Amino acid sequence: MYSSLNIYNQPVTLAPTTVASPNAAYQRMANFWGLVEDLKEGTYKIRSEHRKYLNQEPRETDDAYDTRLARSTVVPYLQRIEKMLSGMLVRKPIRLDDVSDLVREQLFDVDLEGNDLNVWLYQTARVAISFGHVGVLVDAPKDGEKARPYWVTYAPKDILGWRTEIIDGVRKLTQLRLMEQVVESDGKYGEKIVKQIRVLEPGRYEIHRKNNKGEYKLHDEGEMSI
């Protein structure tokens, strides 16, 4: 008999072999993240997975099962709790005391996507509440006279792996791999989405991009100040 419980017993590969291979901690949680994502999408997503979440009884006909499936709904408790708890963080605007005018101006668009600090916090908190944690990278490009720091949010499924070492008695992060998607121009009017993995190590970075064969190859590398 089909059992949807098998999705929670997937083997964990302890030794990543490529830059795109997630580490063990990622693999242990990946199947549970899938359930959270499906719940966030609601009734139609859960119905589309049918027997994964709603098992067919041993003597139940296909027609009877389809009828029961069509009547089944998912109450959006997860979305309600997520919005409620995130909203509590921004019920009042964030106070900015002893902040320079330059920084205050930047906080009106913290992610270069038009979101101010309050909106960014609300959206980031929703991800953290749903999946248990969230990653934030503050990048500060050097090029350009008006270059400024900006914040990038990474959902747990985009944090492929990390390494830590004890250096001078302190545990420090020595490697971080982040999955990203960038939009590039394609022809005169079109655009395409390119998947890439950003590898950060002390003092340097690498960008690996996915090619037509589905492999990630080194696209760019350089030095950085952290």
Short names for language-model regions:
Residues 139-226:
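Structured, contiguous alpha/beta core segments that scaffold functional sites
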Residues 1-153, 167:
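Extended, helix-rich architectural segments
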